[in-house]
Amino acid sequence: SYPINLKNFPRGEESLKATIDKCHAAGLKVGMHMLTSFVGKNDPLVRPKPDPRLLKDAEAVLAADIDAQTQEIPSATPLDQFPLSPAFYGDDRQGLDILIDEEIIHYRQIDHQGRKFLRCVRGFAGTKAAPHKAGAKIHHLVERYGCYLVDLRTSLKDELAERIAGVFNRCGFDMIYFDG
């Protein structure tokens, strides 16, 4: 949702606009740089309840009931489509975060049989650790540069575009660079 950094701009858009106005008064142009369709793990779209319109790719099925403390998550289906490395850059599936119901879980590895997520951190990214029933869907959250991505087939892309355009226009930016 691209919230304004209140550490740097304590009054939100008002502070941001004041900074841009000072730059303009000094004869400078001001640009906005962003990673397009990326959502930070500390964003309100992630915590405390993940927005269902975050991009997911691999899917599995929970093999057994688990409680909120379980650190080995069993799958009834093979996990060969789930990544084994953290997210950086590239076209391959990356990132080690899964979504079950409304809980994000970070896994550190997959067992040799490819049927369990191991060394899991429950209630990851500000979500709440919770019990889950066998048969629940396990979704892999697509990640790049430590951020989740927006599913561009959903209305979330339009909401974020409106948010970004609104801040751009209200604060008086001169240009925007869409990265990523």
Per-region residue spans from a language model:
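Surface-exposed interaction regions enriched in Ser/Thr/Asp/Glu
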Residues: 103, 129-142
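Weak global preference for isoleucine
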Residues: 4, 20, 39, 66, ...
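Aromatic-lined carbohydrate-binding/catalytic grooves of carbohydrate-active enzymes
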Residues: 1-59, 142-180
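Autoprocessing Asn-cyclization modules and mimics
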Residues: 44-122, 126-129
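Glycine/proline-rich, flexible active-site/cofactor-binding loop segments
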Residues: 39, 122, 132-134
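Compositionally biased, intrinsically disordered low-complexity regions
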Residues: 14, 33, 97, 116, ...
